[in-house]
Amino acid sequence: MDVLSAAIAVMRTGQPYSNRLQLGEQWCYRFDRYDGIGFHVLLSGTAWLIPEQGPSIRLDAGDVLLMPHGSPHHLSDSPQVMAAVPVEDATAGDGPADFLCGKYRLDRSRVHPLLAGLPDVIHLSGGVGAHPELDAAITLLAAEVDATRQGQSAALTALVDVLLVYLVRAWLDENPITGWPKAIHDP
């Protein structure tokens, strides 16, 4: 088994979760610290990621975020935090921002050094055209989240796992590699 596969297999506990968030004109949602990994894919519109530490990041359609350490953050229609609502209380809107989100719980007592070495926020900007497999996984996951069918839970679990692998691969392909991430490229 390769290093990335082992890192994910050893840590995951529980059932992955994924959903769509279509948001109205003015909104700001708070994502509290989570004991796992979370992701956001902006399918359409524009938005802002406001991390707990660091500058706000503008998001455009096709941008993908990975929060490898479950760091608290906000998603908003503006670069400043307004009166934030917990994401659990989010209500659907008819605005242009449409997110595909997901998360799964990790056993932090068994953190693999590869995942521990990732930054708090991974932002793949400008679409993901350079990574067609990531595009395909996003398309499949979005279709599965939108439908209610037999086997949906099993499909969502598998697709969230695949999406995580492709997100980490894409980041490793685009960034200088040091430490444990570098080790996976060393035969």
Q: Predicted regions: what is each one?
A:
Residues 1-64, 71-92:
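Generic protein-terminus/edge-of-domain signal
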Residues 38-41, 133-137, 159:
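Amphipathic, well-ordered alpha-helical segments in soluble domains
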Residues 43, 138-146:
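Regular secondary-structure segments
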Residues 44, 105-107:
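Solvent-exposed residues in well-ordered beta-strands and their adjoining turns
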Residues 73, 77-79, 110, 167, ...:
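Short amphipathic alpha-helical interaction/hinge segments
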Residues 99-100, 104, 111-139:
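Aromatic/histidine-rich interaction motifs
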Residues 122-128, 145-160, 164-187:
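Short, Lys/Arg-enriched, Trp-marked, Pro/Gly-tolerant hinge/linker segments that flank
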